[in-house]
Amino acid sequence: MTDFKPTAVPLIACDPFFSVWAFENELTADHTRHWTGNRHSLFGLLFIDGVPFRFLGKACLSSDGRYFPELPALEQVALEVTPTASVYTFRHEACTLKVTFLTPLLPHRLEVMSRPVSYVFYEITPAEEGHTFSVRFDACCELAGDLCGKAHRIAEQDGHAIVGRDEQNVLNRSGDDHRIDWGYLHLVHPSARVELDLHRRFFYTEGRWKDKKKIADEFDASHGDVLPADQVPVLAADSDKLSDCFVIAYDDVKSIMYYHKPMDAYYKKFYGDFDTMLAVAVNEAEALREECAAFDKQKKKKMEKVSSEYAQVGALAF
C-alpha cells in the first residue's frame, strides 16, 4: 500500500445525504459510514470455491457485535483515490480482486453529474485455473433513514430492489448532523432482491444462505410490503461473473426547499423523472467508467505538474 492514507475514503459521493465513506485504512476494518459518522452499511463478500471472504464492511449490525464473529477479510494491498473513483485491490492466493466505487461527477456534463447514482464495479483476476468465484454485495436500509427503529416499505421489480421509510415526510429536516429520512434507496442488478439482516446472521451462524422460498414466505416485496421497525431490510445482489457492476441510486422525491417551495432535483430537467434517469444511468455504466477514467487521467496529469502529493490531495478533494 502507498503511504497516502486519507482520513476517509469516498465510496458514494452524490450529495450530502447520499454520501457513504470508509473511515478506516482497510475497507473491512469497520462498517461504512455517512460523512456525519453514523453507520451506513455497505457489505461485500467474495466466495472462493464456496468459502466466503469479506472485502467490504462488516456484517454484524448489532451495537455490541455479540451476534456473530466476522468472517475473515481479504488482504487489502492497494488503494487509489481519483477525482471520480476510489479503487481498492485485494489479494488471495487464488486471485486478485479489484473493486471500484465510481461516482461520475463530471462537471462538463451536468446531466450526469446531477444523477444520484453510483456504481460498484469489481474485477476478479484468477491466479490459476480450477477455482470458482462469486460476489455478494448488499446495502442496508440505514442509507434511507436518519435513525433506526422505524417501519420500512420494500419493493422488488425488474432487477430493482427498493427500500424507504413507510412514513414519507419529504424535506422534513435540515442541519449538519442529519441523514435523509425520506425517499427510496435502489439497488439495480439482475439478481437484486430484498433480504433481512437476519438472513446475514443466519448465514454466519449456519454456514449457508436461507432458502429463498422461505424468505419469500416472510414477506412479499413484489407487492410493496411494509416491514415493522424491529426488522432491518437490506438490498442484496450476487454475481458469479469475473467482472460485473452493481448500481446503487437514491430517489429523494424532492431535493431542496427553496423559499418554502419543494424543488425537483436538477437531473429531472433532462430526464423528467427518476425511473427514466436511472434506466439511462444503468445503460451507460461501462461508457461512463471509460469517460471517467479519461477525465481522471487528464486531471491527474495537470495536478502532478504541481507535485505528486498535490495530485493525491486534489483527487480526494474533488
Protein language model annotation of sequence segments:
Residues 62-115, 205-229, 315:
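Extended, loop-rich substrate-binding clefts of extracytoplasmic carbohydrate-active enzymes
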